[in-house]
Amino acid sequence: MHLRIHARRNPPRRPAWTLGIWSLFWGCIVSSVWSSSNVASSSSSPGSHSQHEHHFHGSKHHSVPISIYRSPVSLRGGHAGATYIFGKSGGLILYTWPANDRPSTRSDRLAVGFSTTVKDGILVRIDSAPGLGDFLQLHIEQGKIGVVFNIGTVDISIKEERTPVNDGKYHVVRFTRNGGNATLQVDNWPVNEHYPTGNTDNERFQMVKQKIPFKYNRPVEEWLQEKGRQLTIFNTQAQIAIGGKDKGRLFQGQLSGLYYDGLKVLNMAAENNPNIKINGSVRLVGEVPSILGTTQTTSMPPEMSTTVMETTTTMATTTTRKNRSTASIQPTSDDLVSSAECSSDDEDFVECEPSTANPTEPGVRRVPGASEVIRESSSTTGMVVGIVAAAALCILILLYAMYKYRNRDEGSYQVDETRNYISNSAQSNGTLLKEKPPSSKGGHKKQKNKDKEYYV
């Protein structure tokens, strides 16, 4: 009896590339989760920062923060300007140039946002050093906005005559001066212009020139030319007064984003600039109103400094109605500053619509603005799209790997080593198996073919 050993090949081990597929799959999952967490943290960081700032205001001096709302204009603007509210009893913000840094200018640019209901008051006044007499004043007279300035001879006045501005709405006024020429514009209304008619001194000199001895003509002419040059320069500017209290013409309402020849005076006041003094009924938006009958200190404490927001700030307008005051919140931006810095008149302005906002409690996160909602929604959309794309890619790779694994070669074979094993093995009774001598050639071939087995 022949003992046949059929050896079946062991199943092949899993190829190394399948391990790579699984590594790639888990790598995709981990990377998608990591990227989504980064996007979520980046989108939530501005909100958390603003929440921390509001909590700081509440815990520092227990003020009621004003909700910040962003307008389409503020989305285009750069940095926002600070807003101050001037009460009924009047107030004053006074900026004084250092004695060794007082400018003399041939041209000036002034811009400010305001809202008020008073018929008369001084918004801003710039004065030269004592004894010179040069000044520039922005004021409201009979409900209409105007500017009067004097740079050495007579007062030059320019005014918006068409429409009153004491309607309680928010307006932006811009004034430019170049020598004796001046322009004044309110919002996007038509521009008011002023051009001097001529040099009166030169005209008079030409009339009496022939009566003056010849040897005196040259010195007098040079003196008149030098005087004419001086009449175009605002000499040795010393201080900027905001609010009109020092002149007895009190302004009541709100002022925002004041810009004058590169100085953002209200921002400097909010940042506790040492050259600025504040007294009277003046309150920075976001602070606790002072007790009636008391005045603020002449210098601002550090607690009154405000955080300059990215694009916009809110402004509150106070309107006294039978001992009751209501505040309306309106958005603004530094578009008025940028328009004051450039001389082009083709800039567009969006009319500020008054809107009311309920103040939030200290430490409570403010309502997000339109730009924040857009930024958060776009971040969420990007995160979802990234996760879905990564998951789809991983699923496709996994399906392809499973397909290749199922269609691999599953063939097997068996090996018959009967002849070799029998010739070398012992019988069960201990005797060796003796092969029979081949009887014939045909019988040997038959036996050989009989012992062979083939498997496919």
UniProtKB/Swiss-Prot annotation:
Keywords: Angiogenesis, Calcium, Cell adhesion, Cell membrane, Cell projection, Glycoprotein, Heparan sulfate, Membrane, Metal-binding, Proteoglycan, Repeat, Secreted, Signal, Synapse, Transmembrane, Transmembrane helix. Residues 325-340 have a biased composition (Polar residues). GO terms for biological process: angiogenesis; cell adhesion. Processed by alpha-secretase leading to the formation of an extracellular soluble protein as well as a C-terminal membrane-embedded fragment (CTF). Proteolysis of these CTFs by gamma-secretase releases intracellular domains (ICDs) and extracellular peptides. The keyword Glycoprotein applies. Pfam families: Laminin_G_2, Syndecan. PROSITE patterns: LAM_G_DOMAIN. One of its GO terms (molecular function) is metal ion binding. The chain crosses the membrane at residues 382-402. Residues 52-63 have a biased composition (Basic residues). Ca(2+) binds at D134, I151, I233, N235. Neuronal cell surface protein that may be involved in cell recognition and cell adhesion. May mediate intracellular signaling. Functions as part of a trans-synaptic complex by binding to cerebellins and postsynaptic GRID1. This interaction helps regulate the activity of NMDA and AMPA receptors at hippocampal synapses without affecting synapse formation. NRXN3B-CBLN2-GRID1 complex transduce presynaptic signals into postsynaptic AMPAR response. Belongs to the neurexin family. This is Neurexin-3-beta. It comes from Bos taurus.
